[in-house]
Regions:
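Short, contiguous strand/loop micro-motifs
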Residues: 2-3, 88-89, 172
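Rossmann-fold dinucleotide-binding core
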Residues: 92-172
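NAD(P)+-binding Rossmann beta1-loop-alpha1 motif at the extreme N-terminus of oxidoreductases
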Residues: 1-58, 85, 121
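Rossmann-like NAD(P)(H) cofactor-binding subdomain of soluble oxidoreductases
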Residues: 44-52, 56-57, 64-129
Length: 173
C-alpha cells in the first residue's frame, strides 16, 4: 500500500521510517527538512500529487495554518484526492478547524481522521506514541494497522472529527 506522508520533520521522519520498514511504500513532497536517506521514498512536487499517488495521506505539520495550506491550498491534498481515500492528520491543531477540514474532504468522498500524538521525538523514534483519534469507527479500523506501527496506546476518542484534537488539548493542560 502507498502511504503519502507530508511533514518529515523531527516527528514525521521517524514515523515515516517505521511505516517504510513495515513494508508500506512512502510518497512524500519536497519540504524544508532533508529527506532521510534510508526512507527510500518517492518524492513528488505537490501535496495534490502525493494524494493522487496514495491510498492514505498522513500529515504531521507544526500548526493549523500549515495543515490548512497543505490540505486545502493550491495544489493541496484536497485537489488530488478522490472517493475512497483516507486523510489522517497527526498534527496538533485546532479542533474547530479540524472539523471544517474534515467536512471538505467528506464532501469529496474522502475519509478523514484527526490523530494527534503524545510522546515527543523519543516516542516517535521508539514507535511508542500515544495516538488520540477522532473520526468514524470504520475509518479508525482501516487506519489501525498503520497506527500500530507508530504507537502503543491508540484510542478512538470519539466518532466526531476534532475529538482527538480536543483530547490532545486536555492532555496538555
Amino acid at each position: 500500500m502507498k502511504i503519502g506522508f507530508i511533514g518529515l520533520g523531527v516527528m514525521g521522519a521517524p514515523m515515516a521510517r517505521h511505516l517504510a520498514y513495515a513494508g508500506y511504500e512512502i510518497v512524500t513532497v519536497l519540504n524544508r527538512s532533508p529527506l532521510p536517506t534510508d526512507l527510500n521514498a518517492s518524492v513528488v512536487t505537490s501535496a495534490a500529487e502525493v494524494a493522487r499517488m496514495s491510498e492514505i495521506v498522513i500529515t504531521m505539520l507544526p500548526d493549523t495554518p500549515d495543515v490548512e495550506r497543505v490540505l486545502l491550498g493550491q495544489n493541496g491534498v484536497l485537489e488530488g484526492t478522490s472517493a475512497g481515500k483516507l486523510v489522517i492528520d497527526m498534527s496538533s491543531i485546532s479542533p474547530i478547524d479540524t472539523a471544517e477540514f474534515a467536512a471538505k474532504f467528506r464532501q469529496a468522498g474522502t475519509g478523514y481522521l484527526d490523530a494527534p500524538v503524545s510522546g515527543g521525538e523519543v516516542g516517535a523514534k521508539a514507535a511508542s506514541l500515544t495516538i488520540m483519534v477522532g473520526g468514524p469507527a470504520s475509518e479508525f479500523e482501516r487506519a489501525l494497522p498503520i497506527f500500530q506501527k507508530l504507537g502503543k496506546n491508540i484510542n478512538l476518542i470519539g466518532e466526531t472529527n476534532g475529538a482527538g484534537q480536543t483530547c490532545k488539548i486536555a492532555n496538555q493542560i
